[in-house]
Amino acid sequence: MDDLETLDFRELERELANALAADQKYSRENDAKFRAIHQKVASYEEFRDIVLASNLKPLERKDKVGGESKQPWNPSFNTTNCTQKSEDVMLKKSLSDPTNAFEFARDWRRLGNVEKYDFLLQLGAEKLSQLFHAEVCSGLLGEFLLVLSESFQAIHVEKVLKILQTLAETKRFDLNLIFISRSEVESSQKLFGKLQTCVGAMKDEKRGLGDENLRKLMACYKISC
């Protein structure tokens, strides 16, 4: 009984630490965004670099610059097959249900584009709304549009529309939309082109509602008809 209580306490402590880290990361990135805007950066890439740099840990006196490192460039290179299998199992478990934006971003970075598409559909609009109740940063927003465009399947049209609607309702959406890259803008245009085709092929009773929702979404995402 004592061991169980200790284990529960440690799990609670871990979740609290993760939530605190996520809040701190959000605060740093948010400050960096406004700093970049005030600096009037010349490009999206420069804006993104400033936001990403907000999470870098500064060097300390004991850190050596240019010195020989004893740690290999790829620490996981020598892991055994058994360890790799164990990590794969842990990854699948962790992908099942992230509890906050920090855990989502951690899992997201481990996936390929097709897996990312499946991950978004698996979570669905309601779960994404819970994870990103604060905002979806421009980096993730652009990646979402890119992934949805590249892997889109007609059978998922309603799920994708709901996901896009959820993203459009997040805080500072208009600001984050401004800073997505040119390639991500093009992907967004292609995605909505595919959605238009799918909605146009719907039966009459669904097409009217689908057309109306799609027009509103296109206006939100600054897509011209």
UniProtKB/Swiss-Prot annotation:
InterPro entries: CC103, Dynein_attach_N, RPAP3-like_C. The keyword Zinc does not apply. The keyword DNA repair does not apply. Keywords: Cell projection, Cilium, Cilium biogenesis/degradation, Coiled coil, Cytoplasm, Flagellum. It comes from Xenopus tropicalis (Western clawed frog). This is Dynein axonemal assembly factor 19. Disulfide bonds: none annotated. It is found in: Cytoplasm; Cell projection, Cilium, Flagellum.
